[in-house]
């Protein structure tokens, strides 16, 4: 087992019931029955496969098959000068960032009330990890908001953009990418191999049939 940019990789020979796995990872989103009857809501897979391997969501793979033994997702840190954090974490935010960074960096969901500083927490976490970071957004309003916050809290960071035909990602510290572009555009597999941290704003959108196609291109 290994962690790759496409997800948790497991050999098909190590899967006792491939059909059961495929069924478990073919999902149907919740839509209130007042709008659409459940049986008419289409299903879609949240896995990838090749001739020899299945690529499944990271935590599903760990839960079912154990901790991965190798990772191709180790990304070197960039120069600290780009990650100077111009601000301070409030006392209420400290447990949030600590839960991500200690005892060692890992992933999760930042859950704070409106105005609680989720964006600031994410940028602080990025400043501590010091790896190329991509922020996924689904609107130009959020894109502009993130760019403003990056300039304010990481004033020396080099900011990149992914939107439409614009793919400005080389030698960038924080990239703000449109989910629509990344999920729907055909991109070379190596496009985002330099990314070490993925931040998803409004993360409840990422499970949709279209937007879920973005994650295997990034993580």
List each language-model region with its residue ranges.
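SF2 helicase catalytic motif II
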Residues: 180-181, 188-219
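Walker A/P-loop
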Residues: 103-129, 134-136
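Conserved pre-motif I regulatory segment
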Residues: 43, 69-111
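Conserved helix-turn-beta segment of the N-terminal RecA-like "Helicase ATP-binding" lobe
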Residues: 141-166
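Conserved motor-coupling elements within RecA-like helicase/translocase cores
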Residues: 165-175
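Interdomain "pre-motor" coupling segment immediately N-terminal to P-loop NTPase/helicase cores
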Residues: 24-75
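Hydrophobic positions in the central parallel beta-sheet of the AAA+
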Residues: 110, 135, 175-177, 190, ...
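Short Lys/Arg-enriched alpha/beta "domain-start" segment
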Residues: 1-33
């Amino acid at each position: 087992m290994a962690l790759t940019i496409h997800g948790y990789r497991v050999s098909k020979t190590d899967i006792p019931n491939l059909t059961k796995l495929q069924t478990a990872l073919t999902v149907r989103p919740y839509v209130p029955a007042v709008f659409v009857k459940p049986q008419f809501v289409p299903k879609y897979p949240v896995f990838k496969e090749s001739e020899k391997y299945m690529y499944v969501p990271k935590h599903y793979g760990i839960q079912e098959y154990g901790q991965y033994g190798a990772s191709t997702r180790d990304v070197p840190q960039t120069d600290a000068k780009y990650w100077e954090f111009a601000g301070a974490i409030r006392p209420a935010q400290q447990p949030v960032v600590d839960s991500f960074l200690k005892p060692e960096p890992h992933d999760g969901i930042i859950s704070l009330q409106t105005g609680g500083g989720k964006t600031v927490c994410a940028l602080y976490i990025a400043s501590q990890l010091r790896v190329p970071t991509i922020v996924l957004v689904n609107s130009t309003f959020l894109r502009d908001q993130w760019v403003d916050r990056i300039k304010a809290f990481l004033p020396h960071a080099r900011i990149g953009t992914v939107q439409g035909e614009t793919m400005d990602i080389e030698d960038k510290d924080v990239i703000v990418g449109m989910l629509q572009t990344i999920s729907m555009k055909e991109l070379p597999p190596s496009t985002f191999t330099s990314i070490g941290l993925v931040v998803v704003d409004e993360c409840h959108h990422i499970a949709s049939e279209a937007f879920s196609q973005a994650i295997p291109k990034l993580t």
